[in-house]
Amino acid sequence: MTAQNSANKSVFYKFLPYYLNKVKYLRPQLIMSIIFSVLSYPAFMLIINILCPVERELLELSQYISDPTPEQYEMNMALLDKRSLLYSLLIAEIVIGVLSLVGRVIFTFVTTLRSFRCLHNKSVVDMDMSLPINHNTRFFGDLAAVFTVNILPHFIAILLAQILLQFADLSAFDTQGETQAIVHAIMGPMAFTGLFMCIMEIAITLLLISFCGRLAEACIYPILINFAIPVIHLMTINLVESGVYGAVLYPSAISTAVGSAYPITASSPLGMMIMTLYSMMSIGCKGSVSDCGPIFRPEFGIPALLVTLACFAGAYFLII
């Protein structure tokens, strides 16, 4: 009783000890998150940085390809072998990087469930609720632990990749700048969109598990909602634009229909990912940050931010 009375005296009573203990509890997820972070953007840019000097030297040696000396010929063959090996590593890293990003999305969901386990795991409710802390400490401590375990390593990985990008001489790959545009699109709009996508995933998952009460529902509902929201949103847009309700707003061209689907960017993490990939492929990654990443446009970014904040606020008031 005395401990509970002490907890009520402060808004964030014993926040730091509770937060550190929760991060320690989530140590397996933290280790996997760090591994996924290292294998994604930084590893990709590290291989690119190693490959750039090789491409530059091959470009310089190509000037003497018509009449090379024996030393130049041997150097050219050695560089070709090295480039072949590096390209094999790059392809393998792209596959591993994509799998790591998928794993990060999955572990973001798992970490949120484990951090807020008292909402769906009845076997630990009494133990968690008996701790001498108040509801604010419990909610924000759990949420801060999720951000530390999943979002912080992701953000640091993006920053490291941005630093490595500054040292990469991508002009040696092609004269049209296509490689440079693709790499900048991946390291810029796509990377930060993935970061915001994970934050929105945490918000939606937390809102749904706050009133589920069972582990099965807590696992199934966030996944179903993540798919259902963009599908229902897109179907509603198509129904309105096709004249079902008495008005034809746009022509029925496929390109127009796809272009009008951009609002699903703000509806869910899946919608954000779909429209980001579509934007990058439709312009060949050649464009501004807002062209490659719809989330950076105010008309989509602000609603996405409001939806995310609303989910966090709803979860807070439901849990508290």
Predicted segments with their positions:
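Hydrophobic alpha-helical transmembrane segments
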Residues: M1-H120, C311-I320
